[in-house]
């Protein structure tokens, strides 16, 4: 059997004519029925506004909030654009507006609240704005409060009207600006607490006069500030009658009867008033006069300079010159002032008499000074040949640079040996020195501010 090839033709059934007529008239019937029911139940008019429902108060409350944010009167906007609405919804909107602190009659803007709660704002984190409490406040179990937003920067200055600047006749002081409160008249009548209005004259700042080198004053009337009251204090003498003249009591009573005026703060102490005070030198002289009269100050005693003749005894030096330094006491001190002059030979021999002693004090033979000698004198030993430390003890001169102690003849630890040409830099820098001679004393001493020479008597 051979199979068929090609597509098979399908014949669709055609609906009967009755059903076609019913489907065409169905749409028309539905429209007619809709119009009939609308006419019967609607009174022939379509409703302009929707009927109030349970959701209308909430819808209009949010609309009222948006209207209040832009600053429009809520009641007028509802009456003009929304028409007559449910009284319950209008009462709800009015109550909400009253809670926000906004008056419908005035139409003022209410306070602006923060977008984040106070807790999140303080922590500087993003607030989730969940209601009634955000997630962070709910977690910490604290109250979620939205505070009033504050304007950043400096606060705005309050504008005062010009009516507040007018002064009252009872003398009250108003807190207005200085420019509006100042009077332009030259001689105003200041406000008095006693009811009187005296004319006060204040002196202006003095004007310098270059001709005589003095300072002159220019007295003229000065404008008074409205905030500067004057006190009228009348001090009357008990014996003064009502008709008595004020001049009879002298200028003191006249000055007491004059009104006392509070001058503005611009007036400083005038130079004429400053010149009325005596100078400082005269004040010190007046202060010193009674002190001088009670306790006269005597001249200070003059400081006597060391006189070498005061140290010279009555007797002259006698005996061998070998015992020149044998009479040196342990505690004897010789001061060397800077004003010492060059001594001659006779004065040097007289100075030797101070150091005479017997041979028993050989272990404590020394002469010392308590005054600082650095930069005043220096020392040198001349004529002591063949002398040295540990070699020959004849004719040696030891100078101790340490503290003043009892130094024996054999103790050399605190002393330095002086030869023919010694180095005296360390000795000159010391504060105290001691001289000790063993066997061959010097026969002559010469002293000047720069050098102390010890020589043999050849």
UniProtKB/Swiss-Prot annotation:
Residues 117-144 bind DNA. InterPro entries: OAF3 (IPR050675), Zn2-C6_fun-type_DNA-bd_sf (IPR036864), Zn2Cys6_DnaBD (IPR001138). The keyword Secreted does not apply. Disruption phenotype: Significantly decreases 11'-deoxyverticillin A production. Residues 167-186, 193-207, 223-235 have a biased composition (Polar residues). Its main location: nucleus. Coiled coil: none annotated. Pfam families: Zn_clus. This is Transcription factor verZ. It comes from Clonostachys rogersoniana. The gene is verZ.
């Amino acid at each position: 059997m051979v199979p068929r090839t090609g597509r098979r033709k399908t014949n669709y059934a055609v609906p009967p004519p009755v059903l076609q007529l019913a489907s065409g008239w169905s749409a028309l019937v539905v429209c007619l029925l809709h119009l009939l029911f609308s006419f019967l139940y609607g009174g022939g008019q379509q409703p302009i506004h929707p009927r109030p429902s349970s959701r209308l108060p909430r819808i209009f409350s949010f609309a009222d909030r948006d209207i209040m944010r832009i600053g429009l009167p809520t009641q007028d906007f509802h009456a003009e654009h929304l028409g007559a609405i449910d009284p319950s919804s209008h009462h709800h909107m009015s109550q909400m507006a009253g809670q926000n602190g906004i008056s419908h009659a005035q139409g003022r803007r209410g306070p602006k609240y923060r977008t984040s709660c106070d807790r999140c704002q303080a922590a500087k984190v993003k607030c989730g704005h969940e209601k009634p409490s955000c997630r962070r406040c709910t977690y910490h179990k604290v109250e979620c409060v939205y505070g009033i937003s504050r304007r950043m920067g400096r606060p705005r200055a309050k504008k005062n009207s010009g009516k507040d600047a007018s002064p009252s006749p009872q003398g009250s002081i108003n807190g207005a600006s200085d420019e509006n409160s100042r009077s332009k008249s030259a001689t105003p009548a200041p406000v008095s607490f006693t009811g009187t209005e005296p004319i006060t004259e204040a002196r202006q700042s003095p004007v310098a006069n270059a001709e005589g080198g003095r300072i002159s004053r220019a007295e003229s009337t000065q404008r008074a500030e409205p905030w500067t009251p004057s006190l009228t204090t009348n001090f009357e003498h008990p014996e003064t009658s009502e008709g008595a003249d004020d001049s009879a009591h002298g200028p003191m009573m006249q000055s007491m009867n004059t009104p006392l005026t509070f001058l503005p703060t611009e007036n400083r102490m005038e130079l004429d008033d400053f010149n009325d005070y005596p100078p400082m030198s005269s004040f010190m002289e007046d202060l010193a006069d009674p002190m001088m009269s009670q306790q006269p100050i005597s001249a200070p005693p003059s400081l006597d300079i060391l006189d070498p003749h005061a140290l010279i005894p009555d007797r002259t030096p006698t005996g061998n010159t070998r015992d020149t330094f044998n009479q040196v006491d342990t505690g004897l001190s010789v001061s060397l002032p800077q004003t010492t002059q060059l001594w001659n030979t006779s004065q040097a021999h007289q100075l030797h008499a101070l150091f005479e002693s017997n041979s028993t004090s050989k272990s404590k033979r020394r002469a010392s000074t308590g005054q600082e000698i650095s930069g005043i004198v220096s020392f040198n030993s001349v004529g002591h040949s063949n002398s040295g430390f540990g070699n020959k003890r004849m004719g040696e001169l030891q100078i101790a640079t340490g503290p003043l102690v009892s130094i024996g003849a054999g103790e050399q630890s605190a002393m330095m040996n002086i030869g023919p040409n010694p180095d005296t830099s360390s000795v000159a820098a010391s504060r105290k020195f001691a001289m000790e001679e063993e066997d061959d004393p010097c026969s002559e001493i010469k002293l000047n501010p720069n050098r102390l020479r010890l020589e043999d008597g050849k």
